Amino acid sequence: MPLSSAHAPSRQAASRLIIATGNPGKLREFRALLVGLPFELNSLADIGAEPPEETGATFLANATLKARHAVTVAAATSSGVAAAAIADDSGLEVDALGGAPGVKSARYAGLGASDAANNAKLVAALAGVPPAERSARYRCVLVFMRGAADTEPLVAEAVWEGRILDVPRGSGGFGYDPYFWLPELGLSAAELDPARKNRLSHRGRAMQMLRDRLVARDWLTVPTCKHQG
């Protein structure tokens, strides 16, 4: 329902930022990428929340529902402490597979599938596909929501181009990283140190866009409904 003039929006500085992911690898990367922003960083576990079911058909839809879930739970349990949320939905798009696994990247081999199972299915799906036809990209869509009353969250999107290997390389990162080859570097994503990966990756690039927009738009605040009169 639109706000009436008697309930004009006011702004309250956010003191907490909920990182709306249940993925330990993403959580580590988010904590590194968010250094320097004026928030106490909380995970979903910190607010007693489980990740919601990802029912969206697009990365944007899933990122939005995850951010909305986090700020809604935080608002119900925060005792008046303002909280914003950041969520991403990201995945691998392989051209030879018509963009799969896409939004189903985390559950490509089934709900709750391990990274090893997802990678095994990917390798099997690409059996016989020559290296020149294994182009792929990681895509990340980030949503920053300033609170439960935020109807216009900030969105940033970035991609990371590469190719899919048929054998893994490296032991770092998570997900499909050991199979994600970066021709210009001669390395897989799993062979990059964390700091370098965060500078180059889809998530790192999207986060830099988001940080720039937060500063440019002065969005480091949380919208609230404050009765006037």
Question: Language model features by range: what are they?
Answer:
Residues 2-18, 22-229:
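Anionic-ligand binding patches
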